[in-house]
């Protein structure tokens, strides 16, 4: 791997993938949207190309001359005034990238999907790459578009394009400028505005391990295969307490909110967003329905086939807390 294109390069995971590639001496071309915030790329010796994955011509120019493409560009949203954009970017945009890679003779594509595109085991069961997708009726446009785009990638893999798929879990770590949903949980705890929890669990993973997983997938992944990039399965209660302990603050959970009550409250917020504010609500009933499941995943395949190892979660949380505090988030 000598030259690589990274779509979504200015994003949380994407910028860490860029850094991993640079550390290995790879020439990196970054595709960023016109006017997009690029703080995470400041100071890096990279080639910047402006373009939108919805524009086939721009994508075709971007892939020209690279041997590897890392496709991370995607829209993540719990609410939008017009949901068409999430399909245009996540599904059609992915199709544009895959077609450009096939036509341009790109040697390998690492396609960033999500655990959202994998099925959820019942109860507190642990899912793997083989768990059939079972979230069709959830009603989440994000979840559905991630699954549909993953199917596009697998279809191209079956028709001659060397594509390997990675499925990150819930990443956290430094440079989470947005912040991401996992990072926002940490920020809210540090600010003292979140001392409640709800049923469910997640798989947390250091974003730098996720980035490393992309490189390992490019080098060792099998065409047409999925690889879960996750580390530790943890109940939401325990995650809140762990962040509090690492941060040195009171870890008592004041209130555990029943899921039905959360759905009622978020339904009201969603109605206000739809009809009054036209701004994203704090949460939605669909997001609660998804997040209140136990989103537990097995990383065995990434460990055995990609050679992955993972950082200590507590040490990673400590670094994340320090980063947020040093930049005034809390």
Model-derived regions, located:
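Substrate-positioning beta->alpha
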Residues: 96, 148, 181, 198-218, ...
């Amino acid at each position: 791997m000598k030259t690589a294109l990274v779509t979504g390069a200015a994003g949380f995971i994407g910028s860490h993938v860029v850094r991993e590639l640079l550390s290995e001496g790879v020439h990196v071309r970054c595709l960023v949207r016109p006017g997009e915030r690029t703080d995470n790329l400041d100071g890096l010796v990279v080639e910047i190309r402006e373009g939108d994955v919805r524009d086939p011509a721009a994508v075709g120019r971007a892939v020209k001359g690279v041997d590897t493409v890392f496709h991370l560009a995607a829209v993540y949203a719990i609410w939008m005034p017009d949901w068409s954009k999430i399909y245009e970017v996540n599904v059609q945009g992915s199709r544009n990238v895959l077609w450009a890679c096939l036509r341009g003779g790109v040697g390998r594509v690492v396609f960033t999907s999500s655990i959202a595109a994998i099925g959820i085991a019942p109860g507190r069961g642990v899912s793997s790459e083989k768990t059939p997708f079972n979230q069709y009726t959830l009603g989440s446009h994000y979840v559905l578009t991630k699954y549909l785009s993953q199917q596009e990638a697998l279809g191209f893999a079956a028709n001659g394009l060397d594509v390997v798929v990675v499925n990150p879990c819930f990443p956290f770590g430094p440079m989470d400028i947005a912040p991401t949903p996992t990072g926002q949980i940490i920020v809210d705890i540090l600010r003292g505005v979140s001392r409640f929890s709800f049923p469910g669990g997640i798989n947390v993973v250091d974003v730098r391990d996720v980035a490393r997983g992309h490189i390992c997938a490019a080098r060792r992944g099998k065409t047409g295969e999925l690889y879960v990039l996750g580390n530790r399965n943890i109940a939401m209660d325990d995650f809140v307490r762990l962040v509090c302990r690492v941060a040195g603050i009171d870890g008592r959970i004041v209130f555990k909110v029943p899921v039905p009550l959360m759905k009622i409250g978020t339904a009201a917020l969603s109605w206000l967003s739809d009809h009054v504010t036209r701004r994203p609500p704090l949460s939605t009933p669909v997001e609660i329905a998804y997040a209140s499941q136990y989103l537990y995943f097995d990383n065995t395949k990434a460990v055995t086939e990609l050679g992955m190892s993972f950082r200590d979660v507590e040490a990673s949380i400590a670094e994340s807390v320090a980063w947020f505090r040093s930049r005034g988030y809390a």
